[in-house]
């Protein structure tokens, strides 16, 4: 059996296992999440399997550029479908919270945005580290492409959290451990982008940015565990692995769908941005000049 088939099978097994666990824990109430897990697991693992067999072919900017262009529409459409379905579940189907009323619905944006702010930073640090260790130009470009989207989601998490905090805490901001560490995350994103922009040599900029990204990764566990390590106003995790969610099934489904929509959006936008970075950095390469001639013609 080829490596591609093995990875594809593993992807389906993981997706099926996750869907089965949710089904037996919560029954048919989570059928939407089950379908999303199975479908996205199959699609994404199929793409991962494809790249595993063609890694060296697609590791160069020249080969990755057209491949990214073919992938963008798929992730963009997935993001659009998931966000429409997620918003419908979140604002039309999910019940009103008995304590917070309608104000709680901001969690359907706030919580997925907070998740994405951390996940994207880890992905950015990973690609930056790969670029630093293997001297891979494409990996460094991927890290650079992820940073702006990560900063946007971090800012979105902070703003929506402040709007949610006003009716809950009586103020828009407190120097809480969770809020402060999330604000530091925003500064890390901005610092990463500013540092790279301040260095003219792209290779030196990549190395400097990678060091900052890797050092800053220590902030991610601080954000996640801050509510456990310190006495904070911020509530605990909305979802705990191995523990059934306390929220209504439709609330959980809406939150997961919005998180998946944000993730698909991130991939689509990052691919668009990395194509622009490739063209900028490789503008003197022969294949880019040929591409320009073809587009003009």
Each language-model region and where it sits:
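Hydrophobic alpha-helical membrane-insertion segments
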Residues: 209-225
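Short aromatic-rich membrane-water interface segments that cap or initiate transmembrane helices
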Residues: 102-116, 171-183, 240-256
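N-terminal membrane topogenic signal
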Residues: 1-11, 64-78
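Membrane-interface helix-loop-helix modules in multi-pass inner-membrane proteins
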Residues: 3, 22-36, 48, 149-196
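Extramembrane terminal tails and long inter-domain/linker segments of multi-pass membrane proteins
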Residues: 1-2, 48-69, 274-297
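Hydrophobic cores of alpha-helical transmembrane segments in multi-pass inner/ER membrane proteins
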Residues: 12-13, 35-50, 112-127, 184-196, ...
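Alpha-helical transmembrane segments of multi-pass membrane proteins
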Residues: 17-25, 81-97
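Membrane-interface transmembrane-helix boundary segments in multi-pass integral membrane proteins
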Residues: 27-31, 111, 231-264, 287-297
């Amino acid at each position: 059996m080829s490596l591609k088939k093995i990875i594809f099978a593993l992807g389906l097994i993981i997706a099926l296992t996750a869907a089965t666990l949710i089904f037996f824990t919560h029954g048919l109430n989570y059928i939407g999440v089950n379908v999303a897990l199975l479908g996205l697991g199959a699609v994404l693992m199929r793409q991962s399997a494809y790249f595993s067999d063609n890694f060296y072919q697609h590791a160069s900017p020249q080969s990755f550029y057209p491949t990214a262009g073919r992938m963008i529409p798929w992730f963009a459409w997935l993001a659009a479908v998931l966000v429409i379905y997620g918003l419908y579940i979140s604002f039309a189907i999910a019940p009103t919270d008995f304590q917070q009323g309608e104000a709680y619905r901001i969690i359907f944006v706030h919580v997925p945005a907070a998740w994405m702010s951390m996940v994207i930073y880890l992905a950015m640090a990973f690609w930056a580290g790969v670029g630093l260790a293997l001297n891979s130009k494409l990996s460094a470009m991927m890290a650079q492409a992820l940073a702006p989207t990560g900063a946007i989601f971090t800012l979105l998490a902070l703003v929506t959290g402040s709007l949610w905090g006003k009716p809950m805490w009586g103020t828009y901001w407190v120097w809480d451990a969770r809020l402060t560490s999330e604000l530091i995350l925003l500064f890390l994103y901005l610092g990463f982008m500013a540092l790279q922009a301040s260095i003219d040599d792209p290779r030196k900029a990549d190395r400097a940015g990678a060091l900052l990204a890797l050092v800053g990764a220590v902030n991610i566990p601080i954000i996640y565990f801050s509510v456990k390590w310190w006495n904070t106003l911020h509530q605990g995790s909305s979802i705990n692995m191995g523990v059934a969610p306390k929220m209504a099934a439709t609330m959980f489904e809406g939150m997961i769908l919005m998180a998946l929509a944000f993730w698909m959006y991130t991939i689509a936008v990052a691919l668009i941005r990395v194509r622009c970075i490739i063209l900028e950095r490789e503008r003197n390469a022969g294949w880019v000049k040929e591409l320009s001639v073809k587009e003009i013609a």
